[in-house]
UniProtKB/Swiss-Prot annotation:
Homodimer. NCBIfam families: gnd (TIGR00873), PRK09287.1 (NF006765). The active site is at K208, E215. Pathway: Carbohydrate degradation; pentose phosphate pathway; D-ribulose 5-phosphate from D-glucose 6-phosphate (oxidative stage): step 3/3. This is 6-phosphogluconate dehydrogenase, decarboxylating. The keyword NADP applies. The gene is DOR14. The lineage of its organism: Eukaryota, Fungi, Dikarya, Ascomycota, Saccharomycotina. One of its GO terms (biological process) is glycolytic process via Entner-Doudoroff Pathway. It catalyses: 6-phospho-D-gluconate + NADP(+) = D-ribulose 5-phosphate + CO2 + NADPH. Catalyzes the oxidative decarboxylation of 6-phosphogluconate to ribulose 5-phosphate and CO(2), with concomitant reduction of NADP to NADPH. Substrate binds at N128, S154, G155, G156, H211, N212, Y216, K286, R313, R474, H480.
Length: 517
């Protein structure tokens, strides 16, 4: 349990007065929670620590009893053995949070709850639901007078217990009724809760989806830095751990850098050798990174780094194919001693590459959310989102403070790279970034995330790209038309018109239309 100041203790005491009432017929639960896996149990304990009376329910009721007899014993936590009993113990408006497997189980529990709920009651889905499902539930429940909230919850089991990052969205009428609970139990960054209202319908789960996509990108970038140190620098795991420990004291200070340090320091107790080197090099995924990449394609936003992070996991899963290909496909390899003569410069370059690529990853993530806000009619608070991610979640980092500051100063900022801080940072990091990608290519080390981040940056800063030729090709084989470059108009190539040319004739035939291909 966290330490609280005197005012907080008085608040907790007042909240607990109803719990001390022995009359069981009085509805005294502040919030109900369905799903007693570790995340659910820890979030209940967190709420109880903050003075809230929580009613716990699980499909397997024996789990409720075990929880009450052990972790929840002596705390302001009540149990329920049925949905009706859960609802009956809650104050109005009833606030019920689901922490169950995404998909059909969420709909099943909602359907079980509905017969016992009244207009104005609140259902909160705190699982990893896909945002289109949250959009649907928001609409369906609104017709029944039930306020639906889809909330991203990040931070894992530890975060749920000590303070997660919470990203609620849905029916805004619910926010005044859940705001105090959510912001009390959420992680704090510089005294501010890592929780705020995100937006309508499925916006909360959308923001959590993008969070998870960025998480994929951050992890892949870290793995590529590790791979370069291991295979090109020939560093021992302890040395690499030392590098990450140093990086965690600077601009890269973050949860993922911190745990990477810990992993690299950990030795198998049976033989004293680094445990990480004994792990099969095939990475799993639950699909949220893929959701982000697919949505980026749907909205036409080049979220290339997250896409490559997803594909890298797919390639890692092709272990048998890679083993076979490693024997047949030729290319540069580093054998014997490391070709790196200046280790400090090599490490400094990698730090710059990691920092610059991280900036690109977040730039792309916020570009995607900006477009989603336009397409889906949401009002997203980018500064608030960055603040939510500063603590309690997997991608929490010092770096996010600068994003929060940028969007507070310029709420309508379209691209983080155009904000002075990030423009300056990526300019300074560019030399080491390019050197690291160059070494990876030279020595045959795959760095898809570093490389695509750099390609995106160079593409974005290019006033002219070769898409003119691409559009001509499309017009050649499919009559998809094109527009003429400003200043190149003539009697055949008319301004602001879509033009088709018969490319096979000498000089060609020209036609124009206002059709946008």
């Amino acid at each position: 349990m966290k330490n609280f100041n005197a005012l907080s203790r008085l608040s907790i005491l007042s909240k607990q007065l109803s719990f001390n009432n022995t009359n069981s017929s009085i509805a005294r639960g502040d919030i109900g929670l369905i799903g007693l896996a570790v995340m659910g149990q820890n979030l209940i304990l967190n709420m109880a620590d903050h003075g809230y009376t929580v009613v716990a329910y699980n499909r397997t009721t024996a789990k409720v009893d075990r929880f009450l007899e052990n972790e929840a014993k002596g705390k302001s936590i009540l149990g329920a053995h049925s949905i009706k009993e859960l609802v009956d113990q809650l104050k109005r408006p009833r606030r019920i949070m689901l922490l169950v497997k995404a998909g059909a189980p969420v709909d099943e529990f909602i359907n079980q709850l509905l017969p016992y709920l009244e207009e104005g009651d609140i259902i909160i889905d705190g699982g990893n639901s896909h945002f289109p499902d949250s959009n649907r539930r928001y609409e369906e429940l609104a017709k029944k007078g039930i306020l639906f909230v889809g909330s991203g919850v990040s931070g894992g089991e530890e975060g749920a217990r000590t303070g997660p990052s919470l990203m609620p969205g849905g029916n805004e009428k619910a926010w005044p009724h859940i705001k105090e609970i959510f912001q009390d139990v959420a992680a704090k960054s510089d005294g501010e809760p890592c929780c705020d209202w995100v937006g309508d319908a499925g916006a909360g789960h959308y923001v959590k989806m993008v969070h998870n996509g960025i998480e994929y990108g951050d992890m892949q970038l870290i793995c590529e830095a590790y791979d370069l140190m291991k295979r090109v620098g020939k560093f021992e795991d302890k040395e690499i751990g030392d590098v990450f420990a140093t990086w965690n004291k600077g601009v890269l200070d973050s949860f993922l850098i911190e745990i990477t340090r810990d992993i690299l320091y950990y030795n198998d107790p049976t033989d004293g050798k680094p445990l990480v080197e004994k792990i099969l090099d095939t990475a799993g995924q639950k699909g949220t990174g893929k959701w982000t990449a697919v949505n980026a394609l749907d909205l036409g936003i080049p979220v290339t780094l997250i896409g490559e992070a997803v594909f890298s996991r797919c390639l890692s899963a092709m272990k048998a194919e890679r083993v076979e290909a490693s024997k047949a496909l030729k290319g540069p390899q580093v054998t014997g001693e490391s070709p790196i003569t200046d280790k400090k410069q090599f490490i400094d370059d990698l730090e710059q590459a990691l920092y610059a690529s991280k900036i690109i990853s977040y730039t792309q993530g916020f570009m995607l959310m900006n477009q989603a806000a336009k397409d889906y009619g949401w009002k997203l608070n980018n500064a608030g989102i960055a603040l939510m991610w500063r603590g309690g979640c997997i991608i929490r980092s010092v770096f996010l403070a600068e994003i929060t500051a940028a969007y507070r100063k310029k709420p309508d900022l379209e691209n983080l790279l155009l904000y002075p801080f990030f423009n300056d940072a990526i300019t300074k990091a560019q030399s080491g970034w390019r050197a690291s990608v160059g070494k990876a290519i030279q020595y045959g080390i795959p760095t898809p995330a570093f490389s695509t981040a750099l390609a995106f940056y160079d593409g974005l800063r290019s006033e002219r790209l070769p898409a003119n030729l691409l559009q001509a090709q499309r017009d050649y084989f499919g009559a998809h038309t094109f527009k003429v470059l400003p200043g190149q108009e003539n009697e055949l190539l008319k301004k602001d018109e879509w033009i088709h040319i018969n490319w096979t004739g000498r000089g060609g035939d020209v036609s124009s239309t206002t059709y946008d291909a």
